[in-house]
Amino acid sequence: MQLQPLTGSLFARTASVACLLTTLVSCTFNSGGQHADVIVVGAGIAGLSAALEASAAGARVLVVEQNSVGGGHAVKAGGFALVDTALQRDKGIEDSPNLAYRDLFRWGKDPDPYWTRYYVTHSAPDVYDWLTDMGVQFKVILDTPESSVPRFHFTRGTAVNVIIPMLRKALLDPNIEFMWNTRVTELARSRGRIKGVFTVNERDGSKTRLNAPSTILATGGFQNDLKMVRDNWPDKTDVPGQLYKGAGKFATGDGYNFTRWAGADMRNMDRQVTFYSGVPDPRDPSAGKGLYAENPAAIWLASNGRRFVNESANSKQIAAAVSELKPMSYWLIFDTKGSRRFSIRDALAANQQTLRDEILGDPELTATADTLVELARQTGLPEHGLKTSIETWNRMIDVGTDFKFKRFSPGNRATYIRAINEPPFFAMRVYPLTRKSMGGPAINIHAQVVDDSGVPIPGLYAAGELAGVAGINGQHGGSGTFLGPSVITGRVAGRSAGLATPADSVTLPYKPDEHDSRDLAATAPDFGLPGYWHYDQVHRLVFEQAYTCDLCHVSDLPKRLANKSAEMQARLNTCTRCH
């Protein structure tokens, strides 16, 4: 059986029952009966896609999210690799599914043939058109090393501008209910079928069993669990000694544990996307979180003081070069002019400059010296190697050719590539930074989780990064090949689960407890309370930037927990204050 496109008459079936939309903070559901037709675990881009699609198929949907807001890591992510879109045609870019299919195989070596073909064929109607119909505005298309033609689509800014319209549509959907600040602790199984989940409310500790005939796991990757990352490192003999967490806060691998317990065939768990320019987050007391540092004006030196790669090479070439280093880290070297190009990709837009200056001014993270001799002393780099590398670089700038690694040539040199000769000089040591998972429970063409014989596990579906985005990346992650496939796999899972709902399905009415109506301004200093991670992040920024409350809190968004649909929609209007 071949999967059909997600558009058209397949979704003629509509919902017959509407429910009151509210934010669930602490629920008193009993363990009997059915609470939804479909439970979606995770409100990231895959989970939201699944929820919207299941609702379109007529199902009552309950989305369980550990955070107090939706979006997952996508709110800080970038663009979408999309094929033969209206925007490409408007810009005169000729693309086709066949060309994209060949590109993905050339780059990834062995992506999943079925899902790769499905994605390149349907990314335009089922991702681009679907999102633009919600109000998403793609404006920019970038070229990338993976693609024969430009197909890396961006809005004006990060993918938060995709998440906001998706969340708004979900909040307005009478078939979709959200349960925030709630962590799934295990799957519920009865007579061989997954029948729901067990949960705990992160704020008050209350425990609940939620029942549904179908459960979709869209819990994200495991890159925020360093033990899982190391246990699944591709080369067990060469695991980095120092490794920093660079994924979303809640990418802790829970979904992998759930599906493994359910009997899933776990595939390609060693396929991970690692960035190799991570610096410790100076604001992380655990010293485990990292930030992605960038400086196109810098040269990169290994521990011997020598350059080892073209700093402008593609991600595969850089990964191969850094993996050969012992230890697996290197130094960014730049001068005063070059320091202006330094940036932190992971920082919230509102405090980019503050965090950047904090890192440059922290002697534990950045060595600063008026001479190269002093810089060598501070860093432990060999003085001769450091001085020789800088002198060689400056001579190549004068000549106009990088004869060592071909980073530039006459007529082909970016303006920021210049001599390093204006003190003070800077040296910043960078390390591997975890990012994305490309393996996970195997799924079939309906996004059902399958065992090692290919037999579906009844009632269980997976989507997004948890499912390795269906193997579309093969061995090497590409630009935009996570967000788009997350939408596709989420929609397929939602459609399949929604259409599997029995015609006589009956769900229990929701009975949310009274919500906390305290003025949160009075409790703002109480950071670190369980279940308030997002609140903490936002309000730390408020204090840091000396914002006033009315920057975000208007009449539709009072200074308390948002507990009505209108309030939650109003909160969406504040997302871009930070992102």
PLM segments and residue spans:
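Helical element adjacent to the flavin cofactor pocket in flavoenzyme catalytic cores
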Residues: 155-213, 256, 260-262
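A glycine-rich dinucleotide-binding beta-alpha-beta segment and adjacent secondary-structure elements
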Residues: 186, 385-470
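Glycine-rich loop(s) and the adjacent beta-strand/alpha-helix scaffold that form part
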Residues: 203-206, 210-279, 477-492, 496
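An anion/pyrophosphate-binding glycine-rich loop and adjacent beta-alpha core
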Residues: 256-258, 262-381
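Helix-rich C-terminal "cap"/substrate-channel and partner-interaction subdomain
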Residues: 329-424, 496, 500, 512-516
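Sequence context of c-type cytochrome heme-c attachment sites
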Residues: 511-571
